[in-house]
Regions:
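Toprim catalytic domain recognition across nucleic-acid enzymes
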Residues: 1-326
Length: 326
């Protein structure tokens, strides 16, 4: 009932806003102008971001990084800000700690867990294809249509659901066998060998509208028959499907606080407990993990001597323009 009411509300909003406002703009300005429930606020966001970029004035700042042999630490102030706007202050901090002793004042470990990503609907697939391969939404849809209609490799593409219905669960072993080749073979082999079952989070009848999430069909595909574009999209969908049979990615986030000559420094790292679904798919957005280092076994009270200082000059950057993915 709620899904029906939501769809009806969107249709009425399209009529009230789209048709009437478009007609009003066209008559008012004697030009082919249009307005819409989605397009007009989206255009406003684009204009606002463009104005922010044009008004932006870059500023110089500096960071101080110390090499302690096995790991690096970064200076920060009392507000955990690492940027130093004054070059003389940055130089003074660098000289102050050169070859000095650093002492660990705190080691903080927090447990983290990331569940497998949800299955693809068309929008999310278009977003990832744009991030990874710069494909436009239309290009991704066309590729998906070929994989659905010509190759019979993937299910219906024009879906807005990221879930499966319970009646599909008995068909999953056959779908796994269909992708048991190429780079997917070892993963599928492990799923069958360890008798992994699909995550309950992927199955929800109430959240499936006309069509379920995009997954492989029960037809085995000759990968050599796919062109590069088709193989890329097919691989994205298959890997996302396979992640649903794996547990969460579990890890410990480690933050170390140190002092040297009255200045505060910190380092961040990550210790993997269970790789889980990341055995299959590394993830599209891993900037945070890439910035973290592998830390040695550290304890409060440990001391280290500064081996080297890195004083880095940087400039503040304007807000990024929106892409088709964002």
């Amino acid at each position: 009932l709620n899904l029906y009411a939501a769809a009806q509300s969107r249709a009425e909003a399209d009529w009230l806003v789209g048709i009437n406002a478009t007609r009003a703009l066209t008559c008012k300005f004697n030009a082919q102008l249009s307005a819409g429930r989605v397009q007009t606020p989206t255009l406003a966001l684009l204009v606002q971001r463009e104005e922010e970029i044009r008004r932006f004035v870059p500023k110089d700042y500096y960071t101080v990084r110390a090499d302690l042999g096995n790991f690096f630490v970064t200076w920060h102030n009392g507000k955990n800000q690492t940027a130093i706007s004054d070059k003389e202050k940055a130089d003074a901090i660098a000289e102050k700690i050169r070859e000095k002793k650093f002492r660990i004042t705190e080691v903080k470990k927090t447990f983290g867990s990331t569940p497998p990503p949800m299955l693809y609907d068309l929008t999310e697939l278009q977003r990832d294809a744009n991030k990874l391969y710069q494909y436009s939404p239309k290009q991704t849809l066309n590729i998906m249509q070929r994989l659905y209609e010509t190759h019979k490799a993937l299910t219906y593409p024009r879906t807005d659901s990221r879930y499966l219905t319970a009646d599909l669960v008995p068909t999953l072993p056959e779908r796994l066998r269909a992708v048991n080749h190429g780079e997917f073979g070892p993963i599928v082999g492990e799923i069958f060998r360890t008798r992994k079952s699909i995550s309950h989070a992927c199955v929800n009848n109430a959240k499936v509208t006309d069509h379920h999430a995009i997954i492989p069909t029960e037809e085995q595909v000759n990968l050599l028959s796919l062109n590069q574009e088709e193989k890329r999209i097919y691989t994205l969908v298959v890997k996302r499907f396979l992640t649903c049979f794996y547990p969460s990615y579990d890890f410990k986030k480690i933050r170390v606080e140190l002092t040297a000559e009255g200045e505060s420094f910190s380092a961040a790292g990550r210790e993997i407990i269970e790789l889980g679904w990341k055995k299959v798919e590394k993830g599209i957005e891993e900037d945070e993990e890439a910035a973290e280092q592998v830390l040695p076994n550290l304890r409060q009270g440990d001391s280290f001597v500064c081996k080297n200082i890195q004083l880095k000059a940087q400039k503040t950057a304007p807000p990024a323009r929106y892409t088709e993915a964002t």
